[in-house]
């Protein structure tokens, strides 16, 4: 019942225009009433600035608009093998949209595998505002990525995407939280924020190109905040949800897509 109420509020937020969706690689707080962002350390180098997300089709080598025959489908099905990692395998780890994978994800996967962090920032052509992956061919990009991983001695590529959904609920104290008190101002929590995170991971076998995609459990939480600390509270909640989702993603990868559990 509690979860139903929370996500009913999210639905209401959609209708009222106060719901927001942010990628995990660009998760700074934006004040919905002022359209201003609360940021942590400022990004001064354009090389690591957020430029959008990697396309799942490009990472997996799925060619859009290409003619495919039934025989090709049957042959691919016959040759397909389950993607299975082994203890100590080397992983080229990519967080879509980020120059570096987040530290909690690296830490979670490093317990069982060798992790090589790799950029997930798509190249943006100077002539266009959209990401440009080189040739514009998904299969070509995927093979280039596999070649880069192979040259680095990596057995697998793991790329992950994530989004944070949030909705704000005004508390009854909203109208009085701005009233000054002797020596204090805005001391009453006046807003409740509901947030959840969704994560998706793709595993690509560097040698064969076989791949699998899965999503771990979704996590959600709710926090109250005051106006002066809204941005800071938001970022604390973001980092906590990220950590929980990363740990769940790493756990599912080990349990569902590796033989580590059977060797322990």
Which residues fall in each region the model found?
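Bacterial N-terminal signal peptides that target proteins for export
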Residues: 1-7
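C-terminal motif of bacterial Sec signal peptides marking the signal peptidase cleavage site
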Residues: 14-17
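Bacterial signal peptide processing site
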Residues: 19-22
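C-terminal/domain-edge helix-coil "capping" segments
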Residues: 24-80, 164, 188-198, 204-264
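N-terminal segment of the mature soluble domain
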Residues: 82-167
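Short acidic, gly/pro-rich beta-turn/loop elements at beta-sheet edges
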Residues: 103, 170, 211
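Surface-exposed short loop/turn segments
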Residues: 135-206
